[in-house]
Amino acid sequence: MTKKNFKPQGQRTVMGFDFGTKSIGIAIGQELTGSASSLKAVKAQDGIPNWDDIAVQVNEWQPDLMVVGLPLNMDGTAQEVTFKAKKFANRLHNHYAIPVETQDERLTTADAKARLFEQGGYKNLGKGKVDNMSAVIILESFFETSYGE
């Protein structure tokens, strides 16, 4: 991806990631509206994604900022996967030269499952769907934290 001119804060397109060791959920959102939509989840092996699959999404959506969910324990302390998520965030920045921030993602999986169940019952709870909905929630949380929406 070539270097681009980034939009000012409040007008950016933001790509969100729900990091996992087997699957990484992806969502795209707009700061202006504070809304987000899920994209296609990417499979990972021990937290390492197929970077070509991520590049397809990055090249299509041209985000100005990326946000990676940071899995923390309920008391706010780090766990093993927290460090892997931070490493993933650093690799995203190194691959695409796009600013990357992290966002607390405590309880997003439970929230994602509840939303998906509400929309379509148990049949709607596939792993990729949960990861993608988690990515949507991570972005929505980022927008709320950043702009108080």
Curated annotation (Swiss-Prot):
<protein>
    <recommendedName>
        <fullName>Putative pre-16S rRNA nuclease</fullName>
        <ecNumber>3.1.-.-</ecNumber>
    </recommendedName>
</protein>
<dbReference type="InterPro" id="IPR012337">
    <property type="entry name" value="RNaseH-like_sf"/>
</dbReference>
<comment type="similarity">
    <text>Belongs to the YqgF nuclease family.</text>
</comment>
<dbReference type="GO" id="GO:0000967">
    <property type="term" value="P:rRNA 5'-end processing"/>
</dbReference>
<dbReference type="InterPro" id="IPR037027">
    <property type="entry name" value="YqgF/RNaseH-like_dom_sf"/>
</dbReference>
<dbReference type="GO" id="GO:0005829">
    <property type="term" value="C:cytosol"/>
</dbReference>
<dbReference type="GO" id="GO:0004518">
    <property type="term" value="F:nuclease activity"/>
</dbReference>
<keyword id="KW-0690">Ribosome biogenesis</keyword>
<keyword id="KW-0963">Cytoplasm</keyword>
<keyword id="KW-0540">Nuclease</keyword>
<comment type="function">
    <text>Could be a nuclease involved in processing of the 5'-end of pre-16S rRNA.</text>
</comment>
<dbReference type="InterPro" id="IPR006641">
    <property type="entry name" value="YqgF/RNaseH-like_dom"/>
</dbReference>
<dbReference type="Pfam" id="PF03652">
    <property type="entry name" value="RuvX"/>
</dbReference>
<dbReference type="InterPro" id="IPR005227">
    <property type="entry name" value="YqgF"/>
</dbReference>
<keyword id="KW-0378">Hydrolase</keyword>
